[in-house]
């Protein structure tokens, strides 16, 4: 059964220069002047994720993430490995980087043989994941269009890597997908909504805690009232400052010692004039009440796919029918639930309750699943650091998914059962191979050629790649090579046997 999903409707051209997203109160029908409507209260403002000129691709700005995470003492770093830790001159010589960038100097040159090709990586990401985020444009009448961000839509694939999205047939969002308007973008691999929420919180600092201009057509009278209140508040503080100065003329020493702590002095600061304390407190509450994204758990790569979406009949696609049949045969719980529903329907028919029969039929109609095929036009491979690689669609269709990638989560789960032992082993691996003293480490992906490790050291988050000695041919072989890297055998000198 396909669960209903939430679609976020976003107005085109409605954006701010200070934040990626903003929460705004849902407008009432009496307010008027609003050129958009949406299914949730989140407005998409594509300032940090935007289209590349001439390509229409969704561009991911890594500088934005890096700059913002410096303020959180946890930033993302570039994936370019430009120096080697094995060079004694570079180890002992004067550092060419800022202390917060020292990780970059200790990373080795990246070996291309230790990674899957872009086409193989793309095909693997498509096969391993089963949900994607749709971005499409719909019309709301009178020539006004809206952007729709629709997360977590389940899909299945065929033998060529094509995507078939499963949507409830009564979803109103898909009514905007027509033969003339079926151009969409799909994001696969990243937890899109969580990352957008995090970027929204980080974007608050861009405004320097100033209120933004209301672009949705609301009345500016409230803003004017707030400005007047702020002016009165500052004027009162200045009056108190003057009174304090008159009262303390006889004691200049006390004035000097208390001037930094007096109310009037700190009220004259520029930050206090540009930000009302109530506004500051409100923003602090918003930041503190939201759980931040744990960037240590984010995958090493994701996809931005550009293509055309079209409705299909499953009967015309044998591959899809076979996959659906296999899925149904392995889901015993769903079968039992369907049998129970059938029995309940039979009982209701025997009782002659016409209303219950009609309601059950309506429920079945609402749960009818429609399939939409994505005809891929362009594909972009995006790393967690923001590096982007365009991959040919034909190469992706010819490539085969990695044989070990499907078992990656299970291998990681078994390794993490060791608890602190595996954590210390991963930290030791970073130190032995890259001379990096990691504070936090986490396995984020495994394939037949090696594994990706996410580490936090100081104010930076970095991803490292460790290659296997030989290509893994099975799940057990891959896990064995990982354990061999984490727990190397030490060569101990043989003790002579006593005579």
Curated annotation (Swiss-Prot):
The modification Phosphoserine is found at residue 355. Residues 87-104 have a biased composition (Basic and acidic residues). InterPro entries: Haem_oxidase_HugZ-like_sf. Residues 208-263 have a biased composition (Acidic residues). Residues 76-118, 208-268, 478-499 are annotated as: Disordered. PANTHER family: CREG1 PROTEIN (PTHR13343), PENTATRICOPEPTIDE REPEAT (PPR) SUPERFAMILY PROTEIN (PTHR13343:SF28). This is Uncharacterized protein At3g49140. Residues 489-499 have a biased composition (Polar residues). It comes from the Eukaryota. Keywords: Phosphoprotein.
């Amino acid at each position: 059964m396909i669960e209903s999903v939430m679609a976020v409707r976003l107005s085109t051209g409605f954006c701010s220069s200070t934040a990626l997203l903003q929460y705004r109160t849902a407008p009432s029908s009496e307010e008027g002047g609003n050129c958009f409507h949406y299914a949730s209260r989140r407005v998409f403002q594509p300032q940090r994720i935007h289209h590349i000129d001439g390509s229409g691709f969704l561009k991911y700005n890594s500088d934005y993430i890096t700059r913002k995470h410096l303020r959180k003492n946890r930033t993302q770093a570039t994936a370019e490995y430009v120096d080697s830790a094995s060079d004694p001159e570079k180890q002992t010589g004067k550092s060419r980087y800022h202390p917060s960038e020292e990780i970059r100097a200790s990373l080795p040159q990246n070996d291309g043989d230790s990674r899957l090709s872009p086409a193989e990586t793309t095909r693997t990401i498509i096969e391993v994941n089963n949900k994607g985020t749709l971005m499409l444009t719909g019309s709301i009448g009178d020539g006004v269009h809206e952007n729709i961000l629709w997360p977590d839509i389940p899909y299945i694939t065929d033998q060529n890597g094509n995507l078939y999205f499963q949507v409830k047939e009564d979803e109103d969002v898909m009514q905007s997908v027509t033969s003339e308007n079926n151009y969409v973008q799909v994001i696969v691999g990243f937890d899109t909504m969580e990352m957008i929420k995090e970027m929204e919180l980080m974007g608050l600092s861009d405004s320097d805690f100033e209120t933004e201009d209301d672009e949705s057509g609301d009345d500016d009278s409230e803003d004017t009232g707030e400005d007047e209140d702020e002016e009165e508040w500052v004027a009162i503080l200045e009056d108190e400052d003057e009174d304090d100065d008159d009262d303390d003329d006889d004691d200049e020493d006390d004035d000097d010692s208390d001037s930094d702590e007096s109310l009037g002095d700190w009220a004259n600061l520029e930050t206090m004039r540009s930000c009302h304390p109530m506004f500051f407190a409100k923003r602090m509450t918003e930041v503190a009440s939201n759980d931040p994204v744990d960037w240590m758990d984010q995958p090493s790569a994701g996809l931005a796919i550009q293509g055309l979406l079209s409705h299909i009949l499953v009967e015309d696609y044998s591959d899809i029918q076979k996959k659906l049949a296999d899925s149904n045969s392995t889901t015993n719980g769903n079968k039992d639930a369907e049998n129970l529903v059938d029995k309940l329907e039979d009982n209701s028919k025997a009782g002659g309750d016409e209303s219950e029969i009609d309601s059950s039929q309506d429920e079945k109609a609402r749960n009818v699943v429609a399939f939409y095929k994505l005809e891929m036009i362009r594909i972009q491979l995006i790393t967690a650091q923001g590096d982007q690689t365009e991959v040919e669609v034909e190469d992706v269709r010819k490539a085969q998914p990695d044989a070990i990638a499907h078992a990656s989560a299970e291998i990681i789960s078994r390794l993490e059962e060791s608890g602190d032992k595996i954590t210390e082993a991963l930290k030791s691996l970073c130190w032995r191979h890259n001379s990096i003293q990691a504070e936090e480490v986490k396995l984020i992906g495994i394939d037949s050629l090696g594994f990706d490790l996410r580490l936090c050291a100081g104010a930076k988050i970095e991803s490292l790649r460790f290659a296997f000695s030989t290509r893994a041919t099975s799940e057990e072989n891959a896990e064995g090579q990982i354990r061999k890297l984490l727990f190397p055998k030490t060569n101990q000198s043989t003790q002579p046997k006593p005579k």
